[in-house]
């Protein structure tokens, strides 16, 4: 298998024995490995993991989908049961240090938290997966199935240089894999009770580019209409006419599970969400209090990018907008696009599909889902595990599309609101909770992959 020449400082930080590795220290180092996407440079992360595998004598393979866009994977051979993959992405979104209390690309410990870009999404879980993989390697004689570790590029921009590329160009890495753990769900503490969500499906991203054309001219002589005004009118109509609300089965199950720990009117509302969404003012109130819960009730579109003239005194002949739409996974993209066109086409808008994926759902009858339930209940007796629909998308859509039962789960327990730094400022993780999650992920892997 292919080996890499890695930077010396990676080798210096790694001890010979996996027993001597500290997950918090490893995560601190990993945060300092620059994989901000764009441009990605995920080969830096490949070198990071390769240095660990080299020192521990673990064979691995690597591949670049483009210069600097590295992917790495390793397999531990086990018994004859279908293989299980631990999948992570190594890229992170940009961070502006001016808005942080710490350097986002330096793992900083402060008041019991580790701060840094990616500690939640998803270098923290990635390192936890590494430690679960190393535990399996140390106990490989007990394995009832192969365990595959895979760290890929580009998830934050769609995964086309990462997991998607791997499936097309290195399908052998997925040989025999029928179970997969990825990002997507985690635990939240509500007083003395805990709810752990496991992502089983996700809203389908439909990214669109809108184009409006009109007569150019001088800014001093406004025309009755222009490319920009047409685009503004179309976007205003889109914004003011949200898609009809509906509750699909996985979302209904999730809301009912949340209702168990609620009281009074809120409990009644969440127990019967198909009826509740019809109440006047409810959806507006839900969006204000919890945008993520509201996003589970309907298809959504966020206007994220605008492009017009390059000069303030020039009326441009063409204007553009890009829109991030997320579709509930109960219908096809074509049907959604028809609904979208009804809202903008009368304004002379051309629509270009940038990206869209197909919907897929993983079964809660899976042995991996049951292992998550068992270990979580064992470690947190007052907890409940609920299947969830993610409003965002992960690389799991690639693997679900080829029949791999894929679940998004991080066993870390957090207080409500602790995840606010994801893709934002001051992303942080509680160190005590993080250490516990590393051990719990080992237990989940042992439950599903070790001979009893």
How would you describe each model-predicted region?
Residues 4-13:
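Sec-dependent N-terminal signal peptides
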Residues 19-117, 123, 130, 136-145:
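Acidic/His- and Gly-rich active-site-bordering loop/insert found
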Residues 25-35, 211-214, 347-355:
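Acidic/histidine-rich, surface-exposed loop or edge segments in extracytoplasmic proteins
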Residues 32-40, 114-119, 196, 217-221, ...:
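Second-shell loop/turn segments in exported
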Residues 78, 189-190, 247-310, 317, ...:
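An extended, acidic, His-containing surface patch that forms the Zn2+-binding/catalytic region
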Residues 114, 120-197:
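Acidic/histidine-rich catalytic neighborhood of metal-dependent amide-processing enzymes
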Residues 164-166, 220-244:
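A short core secondary-structure module
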Residues 225, 336-344:
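Short amphipathic alpha-helices in soluble, non-transmembrane regions
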